[in-house]
Amino acid sequence: LFNQVNITFDYFHDHRDRILMKRASFPKILGYWGSTPWSNIGEVINQGVELSVNWNKQIGKDWIVDFRGNFTYNQNEYKYVDEPDYPYVWQTDTGKPLNTLKGYIAEGLFTSQEEIDNWADQSQLGANIMPGDIKYRDINGDGQITSEDKVLLSTYNNMPRIQYGLGLNVRYKKIDFGVFFNGSAKRKIMI
């Protein structure tokens, strides 16, 4: 049995620094209005595990059966991102996974003009608000829905944290049949 099984396990921890990124906290006194310089200041940690199992057996002289499976878990985190001095801690990216999903928290739908008039002003979102539109939560309590009301919706993003697969290959003489199934988990997609 052990001559027919091949198992591979890898752990990885990758710490990258001096990543090229656009400066966001550059003082305006230096004359960079709206266009800040690029600099090698970013820092990211990427870590996880990979497991692969392969079983191969020859049955008689004409049949070969091969079964394989794999599993990968990956997690990353910004250790340092040059960010502006945000007024609220929930707006920062440092210490969070890459490409987290941020957005507004929906409180339901507006049902009347009176409800719209008594809700936080959403006009900065660019639409003429009418009954039936989504009403968003005023996170910072300033009476207006702005980019400062965006929060972390999920630490998952469109890049899956878990990937897996199962495969089977059967060969008889010079004819072979193979099938492979793969999937992913721990991801979110905004639609």
Positions of predicted regions on the chain:
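Generic alpha-helix detector with strongest preference for long hydrophobic helices that associate
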Residues: 32-34, 50, 149, 156, ...
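Conserved small-residue
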Residues: 56-158, 189
